[in-house]
Amino acid sequence: MQNTKLYSLTLIALGAAIIAVLSPLAIPIGIVPVTLQTLAVGLVATVLKARETFFAILLYLLLGFIGIPVFTGGTSGIAVLFGPTGGFLLAFLVMGTLISWGLHQIKYKTIPAFIINIVGHLLMLVIGTLWLKFFTQVDWSLALKLGFTPFVFVEIIKAILVTIFGLALIRALSHTNKYFTN
């Protein structure tokens, strides 16, 4: 029992570290930059189980909240987490947990895994755009233009990459560790 808890905590810390290392890398386009954050969240969600995924993302958000520069562009703090783009960050909890839970339910079958990852990434965009719209009080057209439309294609590509690499990683790890078996 102790080893299982320790292993789970280790996976949570490792998941948060992966997200934290990749998140500061960004390509600025508009108010919401294209980042490796969603790629990292998707990868963690694809490889880890829902509980570990949720807590890895929560730990990552807490690190940024307390001032460690782990958000896009090396930013951090309450103003980022609860600012105009904070909805995208908070949506990672929903995105990651949904992806992880869904993949476990379908036993990591390839085609459904692509669909689940794409839906998770698009759901994150919807939640983030809703937050952006209500936070900034812009009209729907502008909110979609700033937070959704420019990122749909990129997020679908990220979801496809995450599925390919994540499933390959799970298959490789399942030979050495029963955590990664269905």
Swiss-Prot record:
Entry annotated with the keyword Cell membrane: yes
Membrane spanning residue stretches: 12-32, 54-74, 78-98, 111-131, 150-170
Alphabetical list of InterPro entries matching this protein: BioY
MF annotations from Gene Ontology: biotin transmembrane transporter activity
Predominant localisation class: membrane
GO cellular component terms given for this protein: plasma membrane
Signal peptide interval: none
Short name of one Pfam family: BioY
Keyword field: Cell membrane, Membrane, Transmembrane, Transmembrane helix, Transport
Recorded topology in the membrane: Multi-pass membrane protein
Compartments, record wording: Cell membrane
Sequence similarity: Belongs to the BioY family.
Record's subunit section: In E.coli forms a stable energy-coupling factor (ECF) transporter complex composed of 2 membrane-embedded substrate-binding protein (S component), 2 ATP-binding proteins (A and A' components) and 2 transmembrane proteins (T component), probably with a stoichiometry of 2:1:1:2. May be able to interact with more than 1 S component at a time.
Summary of the function given for this chain in its UniProt record: Probably a biotin-binding protein that interacts with the energy-coupling factor (ECF) ABC-transporter complex. Unlike classic ABC transporters this ECF transporter provides the energy necessary to transport a number of different substrates. The substrates themselves are bound by transmembrane, not extracytoplasmic soluble proteins.
Protein known as: Biotin transporter BioY2
Protein source organism: Lactococcus lactis subsp. cremoris (strain MG1363)
Lineage, top ranks: Bacteria, Bacillati, Bacillota, Bacilli, Lactobacillales
